[in-house]
């Protein structure tokens, strides 16, 4: 702690010196507007570590999914157990799976202000306006779903004039994508505007099943449709309506014994998800404040299945080893938030205070139907083979009710004190066919206080203290109920206290845009999940146990720099440095002082953008991270990697032609690892890794109208 405090002091002093002594600015860099906060504000007024991905960065990605964009964000990782990444980690904090059907997210995930926490797989990014990744607890803004941070995606809103875009992509591994988005005023009435989006993405999936002689057992077959309507009812009242559907029909044949991209499964699984969403926003202006209502609902159907033995009769011979698992999941959510947002403060008019007050209600319902079957036989056993079959169902319902508020006070025209608080009540009801039932409740509170110094030229310096929280829960598969006396049944809420200082400034006549953040986080009652396999010969017999470690520590540095070397050449660097530690976990002394899972010490993205002529451009970037532990259940680690991507484009009037390569040097890198025995007859514990996508090449054509 002393070293960290000393580092923080040095960082603060140096940033203060540069902040007050270097001649900066002329406003040549376009102002970034924060859209994920309660009110849209310039980035200079933001008091969080947030990284922005604008529409140009998003359009430049050949594969339109947030999973691809996440590589550009330091201290953001994901667990690739499934066909699409659903679970993300920010600064080493976040779930890596969701097998049990009791949602409890650490990373908030909002798309157009609709909560998809724990369902990040649906985050297709065609016709997206901006993505904001908030690193650090958002206790006052979001509450229990954002202990580690928040991923906020804003799709394009309807425009006053008719406009649109279309895109066609073709690439190796069967990559084919087509999309169109358009909208504007409805007839001649500009009070009602709309935007319609249709998109289809397909790919073979970068794997080949040698047993079935097929290259599509991990294919991507994804569609996105979205309609947004904005209606200016009166001069004081505005309504926004959204309806969307994302349908991911993706088989999941991704795990292999040898870690290669050649699978052997005889019964490939599925990782499909279909989500229908509805949202209504109402804004009504009163004298001095605006009343806002956000109403949303989602309905999600998931099929998650897999060939648990990863092989076939020939690969396991002479042993009979054949297991399969399928989970059918239905999740429904309803969310209602009411806010009163004051008019912005203005020091020059003696308006020193701006405030937000509101209430939020979130209801979640989930049902799961799980079916497992298996067959195991040893040729030396005259009584085999032995068949197994297991089926269970469960129901889960939770409700979160919270009250929140935020007060900003202008101490001067350039100095603002901000204070926010949130109180939340959580109740859950769980029951299953195994006679397990639980009715836990928690009351939690969090908040934030910050001091922000800004200048008229767009630079800012801030210091903040924030507290986030995450509800507790219960462990399944112990054969116990809520009233049973066992220390392993329930676990407590986790709290995170985060200390942060940051700077956002422009240097050298605005040719450099620099953001830097130093943070230190204390985790109280850290929730740690470990898994065990009860029957080594049955890969479907894993149990999961979550316990509270006494504490954890996460601290580090985050930096983003964009530099215009010339009018036609620019470079960028995004860097994250992260140190994590598990401390004082009484039941797992072997993990004392070890780094937390999925928390690489260094993550980075750097690249250049070059415009050699008026009509051509070249973009190349390098992304990567250092090794990290796969789990808190074992000490196996990934290997460090760096991956390169290239885009070469030509622009002519409204047409854009692009040649792209992802994973330019065909880097072989792992994104997830399991440690258990899956090879008969001894079932020796072995590290099995899932590797990322190989090099793929394609062309994209875009027409804007």
Language model features: what each stretch is:
Residues 31, 67, 87-89, 133, ...:
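N-terminal periplasmic accessory domains that precede
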Residues 163-165, 170-203, 207-250, 274-280, ...:
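Transmembrane beta-barrel wall of Gram-negative outer-membrane proteins
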Residues 230-235, 244, 340-343, 352-356, ...:
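Structural signature of Gram-negative outer-membrane beta-barrels, strongest in the C-terminal barrel
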Residues 281-308, 454, 458-466, 490-555, ...:
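Membrane-embedded beta-barrel scaffold of Gram-negative outer-membrane proteins
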């Amino acid at each position: 702690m002393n070293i960290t405090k000393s580092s923080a002091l040095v960082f603060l002093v140096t940033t203060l010196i540069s902040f007050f002594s270097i001649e900066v600015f002329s406003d040549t860099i376009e102002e970034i507007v924060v859209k994920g906060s309660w009110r849209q504000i310039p980035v200079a007024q933001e008091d969080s570590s947030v990284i922005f991905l604008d529409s140009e960065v998003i359009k430049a990605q050949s594969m339109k999914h947030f999973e691809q964009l996440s590589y550009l964000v330091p201290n953001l990782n994901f667990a690739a157990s499934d066909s699409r990444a659903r679970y993300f980690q920010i600064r080493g904090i976040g779930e890596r799976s969701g097998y049990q059907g009791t949602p409890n997210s650490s990373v908030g995930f909002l798309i157009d202000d609709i909560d998809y926490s724990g369902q990040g797989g649906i985050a297709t990014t065609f016709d997206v306006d901006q993505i904001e990744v908030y690193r650090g607890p958002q206790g006052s803004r979001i509450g229990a779903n954002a202990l580690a941070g928040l991923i906020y995606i804003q799709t394009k809103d309807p425009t006053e004039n008719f406009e649109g875009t279309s895109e066609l992509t073709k690439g190796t591994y069967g990559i084919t994508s087509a999309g169109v988005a358009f909208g504007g005023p409805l007839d001649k009435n500009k009070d009602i505007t709309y935007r319609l989006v249709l998109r289809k993405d397909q790919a073979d999936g970068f794997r080949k099943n040698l047993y079935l002689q097929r290259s599509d057992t991990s294919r991507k077959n994804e569609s996105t449709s979205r309609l947004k309507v904005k209606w200016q009812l009166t001069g004081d009242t505005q309504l926004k309506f959204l309806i969307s559907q994302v349908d991911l029909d993706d088989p999941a044949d991704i795990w292999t014994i040898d870690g290669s991209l050649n699978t052997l499964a005889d019964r490939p699984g599925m990782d499909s998800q279909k989500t229908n969403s509805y949202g209504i926003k109402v804004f009504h202006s009163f004298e001095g404040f605006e009343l806002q209502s956000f109403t949303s609902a989602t309905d999600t159907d998931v099929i998650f299945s897999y060939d648990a033995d990863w092989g076939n009769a020939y690969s396991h011979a002479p042993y009979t080893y054949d297991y399969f698992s399928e989970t059918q999941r239905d999740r429904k959510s309803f969310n209602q938030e009411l806010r009163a947002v004051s008019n912005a403060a203005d020091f020059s008019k003696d308006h020193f205070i701006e405030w937000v007050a509101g209430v939020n209600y979130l209801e979640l319902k989930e049902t799961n139907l799980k079916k497992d079957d298996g067959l195991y036989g040893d040729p030396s056993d005259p009584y085999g083979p032995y068949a197994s079959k297991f089926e269970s169902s469960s129901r889960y319902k939770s409700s979160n009710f919270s009250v929140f508020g935020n007060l900003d006070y202008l101490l001067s025209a350039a100095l603002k004190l901000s204070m926010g608080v949130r109180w939340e009540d959580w109740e859950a009801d769980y029951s299953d066919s195994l006679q397990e039932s639980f009715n836990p409740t928690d009351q939690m509170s969090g908040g934030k206080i910050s001091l922000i110094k800004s200048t008229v030229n767009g630079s800012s310096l801030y210091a903040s203290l924030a507290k986030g929280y995450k509800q507790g829960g219960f462990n399944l598969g112990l054969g116990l109920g809520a009233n049973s006396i066992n220390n392993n049944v329930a676990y407590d809420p986790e709290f995170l206290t985060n200390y942060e200082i940051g700077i956002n400034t422009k240097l050298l006549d605005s040719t450099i845009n620099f953001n830097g953040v130093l943070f230190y986080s204390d985790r109280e009652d850290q929730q740690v999940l470990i898994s065990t396999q009860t029957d080594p010969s049955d890969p479907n017999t894993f149990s999961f146990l979550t316990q509270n470690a006494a504490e954890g520590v996460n601290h580090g540095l985050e930096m983003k720099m964009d530099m215009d070397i010339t009018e036609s050449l620019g470079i960028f660097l995004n860097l994250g440095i992260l140190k994590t530690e598990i401390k004082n976990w009484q039941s797992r002394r072997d993990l004392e002082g070890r780094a937390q899972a999925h928390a690489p010490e260094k993550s980075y993205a750097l690249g250049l953008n070059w415009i050699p002529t008026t009509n051509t451009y070249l973009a190349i970037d390098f992304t990567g991270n250092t090794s990290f532990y796969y789990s808190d259940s074992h000490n196996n680690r990934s290997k460090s990697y760096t991956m390169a991507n290239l885009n070469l484009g030509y622009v002519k009037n409204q047409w854009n032609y692009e040649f792209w390569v992802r994973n330019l040097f065909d880097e072989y890198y792992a994104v997830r690892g399991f440690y258990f025995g899956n090879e008969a007859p001894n079932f020796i514990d072995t590290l099995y890794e899932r590797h990322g996508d190989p090099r793929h090449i394609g062309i994209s054509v875009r027409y804007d109208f």
